[in-house]
Amino acid sequence: MAYPSTHKLTVVHVSAHSPSIGASPVAEYLRVPFRCSIEKLTAVANGSITTADCSIAVALNGAAISGSPFTLPVAGAGVGQVASMTPTAKSYANEDDTISFTPSGASGANIPATFTAVLKQA
């Protein structure tokens, strides 16, 4: 059994849900609740994409976050498939900034997904 990793109270996970990352992708947005650094970005598929990988561009107030886009691969696609990215350079955000997740490239009808940003209070 794996041991759970503990997170300090200064680390918060904020999530948004997209109704489709497949043939008709829908971008989703998160409001940043406090001054922070962006530690990790993840996507969890709630269905199986087909044909091609899903590329997920992530931006802070419209500017790409370093290391973006990341990929949810079609290989092994299925419900609960997780893809994640750690920014290649520190990215800092202020309260009320916006983080956007823009999926593209995958196919399959109405494949929902949940996007999460792991934020560490400054």
Predicted regions and their residues:
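Cysteine-clustered segments with highest specificity for TGF-beta superfamily mature ligands
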Residues: A93-G105
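Exposed beta-strand and adjacent loop surfaces of beta-rich binding modules
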Residues: I38-K40, D53-S55, P69, P112-T114
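Terminal beta-strand-rich extracellular "head" domains
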Residues: S48-E95
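A short beta-strand element within beta-rich, extracytoplasmic domains
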Residues: C36-G47
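C-terminal interaction-tip segments
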Residues: A2-S18, A23, A106-A122
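Short, charged beta-strand/loop "edge" motif centered at a coil->beta-strand transition
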Residues: A23-L30, V44-N46
